[in-house]
Amino acid sequence: MAKKSMIAKNDQRKVIVERYAEKRLALKKALVNPESTDEQREEARLGLQKLPRNASPIRLRNRDAIDGRPRGTLQKFGISRVRFRDMAHRGELPGIKKSSW
């Protein structure tokens, strides 16, 4: 079980990323647009620097949806590898069975 403060911090970051997503995308497009002038690129770069650090999606952490474990998370299921294995053995994941050869 992860610390509740770390789970809450990650949830708060998700909100901030969502809030600034459109503005961040517009600034990034201005940076890579070949038709924009050097002044426009400079303004876009400064605009990106003024955004909060937590507005970047890179700072988000994929966590287990049930207990918040930060590592070994399977994206397809949203749970950690440990929890996935337990749930699969108990038959709680439809369509998942242990392979044997």
Curated annotation (Swiss-Prot):
InterPro entries membership: Ribosomal_uS14 (IPR001209), Ribosomal_uS14_bac/plastid (IPR023036)
Any Pfam family matching the protein: Ribosomal_S14
SUPFAM superfamilies to which the protein is assigned, alphabetical: Glucocorticoid receptor-like (DNA-binding domain)
Disulphide bonds in the chain: none
GO MF term list: rRNA binding; structural constituent of ribosome
Keyword Thylakoid: no
Keywords: Ribonucleoprotein, Ribosomal protein, RNA-binding, rRNA-binding
GO process annotations (BP): translation
CC terms in the record's Gene Ontology section: small ribosomal subunit
Subunit record text: Part of the 30S ribosomal subunit. Contacts proteins S3 and S10.
Biological role: Binds 16S rRNA, required for the assembly of 30S particles and may also be responsible for determining the conformation of the 16S rRNA at the A site.
Family: Belongs to the universal ribosomal protein uS14 family.
Database matches in HAMAP family: Ribosomal_uS14_1 (MF_00537)
Listed name of the protein: Small ribosomal subunit protein uS14
Source organism phylogeny: Bacteria, Bacillati, Actinomycetota, Actinomycetes, Micrococcales
Underlying gene: rpsN
